[in-house]
């Protein structure tokens, strides 16, 4: 059934808004790469399974980073997959380091960049050492903001630095790999770090930024709500407020509310069904559950609807032990 939004937009605008061309190009590439396997099932079934996986959000599993960040839907799907696969970390009350969370991210995306994980951890840890422990919920909501709004935050960081230095507010901000959050943060003793910038002026710049750029931004009304509650704030104070804001989490729509983060009955039922199908696995997990706080390096995975497409990627992901495994988390 077509949504009212679909009917209100011209065809070409709706296709562009939903990034349909991106998925068509990816589907055709996979069709060509796996044509021998697909020929025995049929092209029509392949496209049906591919777009069903896109709708279900499983199409991003074990894919390259350039693909999972290509569209807002891909980013939201990756966030949801990370939560569903590893929420047992939070359910067990385990605290992990930034490197350990990065290992988990690489199980779903082998080439996931360490830099993004570090930025998410910085939102939680602020000025603590990067090897400090973090709860799953704290890291997840910080990671959600950093990953989904990464381009927006690059420009926000550049605006913040310009306000601190008193630069012309009409300067156009172009996010690059060497700008924004990559800039050297002020020393702890600096007045700019302690006092931040004026919230009203900061909001004016952010409002213009949201109007000017097409990439995903938090709803301006919610950003205004955050900034209207303070007179001054720091950059990382702003990121913390974004990560903890209930309305922004709802607007993004990838994760449940914090109170429901550990509950996923559908996933629990599916995992139980999969575990029963593997002889001896349930007894093995029960016997070793107290000896290990981290989930297995090869946890049960939600299979792609089109198995030949992802078989090689799964093998690559399972053989890519690029980071060390932690046997026990600190308490």
UniProtKB/Swiss-Prot annotation:
It comes from the Eukaryota. Residues 1-225 are annotated as: Required for interaction with TPGS1, LRRC49, and TTLL1. GO terms for cellular component: centriolar satellite; cytoplasm; microtubule. Residues 1-111 are annotated as: Required for interaction with PCM1. Residues 318-331 have a biased composition (Acidic residues). It is found in: Cytoplasm, Cytoskeleton, Microtubule organizing center, Centrosome, Centriolar satellite; Cytoplasm, Cytoskeleton. The modification Phosphoserine is found at residue 319. One of its GO terms (biological process) is regulation of protein complex stability. Residues 292-331 are annotated as: Disordered. Regulator of the tubulin polyglutamylase complex (TPGC) that controls cytoskeletal organization, nuclear shape, and cilium disassembly by balancing microtubule and actin assembly. Regulates the assembly and stability of the TPGC and thereby modulates polyglutamylation of the microtubule, which antagonizes MAP4 binding. Belongs to the CSTPP1 family. Interacts with PCM1. Interacts with TTLL1, TPGS1, TPGS2 and LRRC49; the interactions link CSTPP1 to the complex TPGC. Binds to alpha-tubulin. This is Centriolar satellite-associated tubulin polyglutamylase complex regulator 1. It comes from Mus musculus. The gene is Cstpp1.
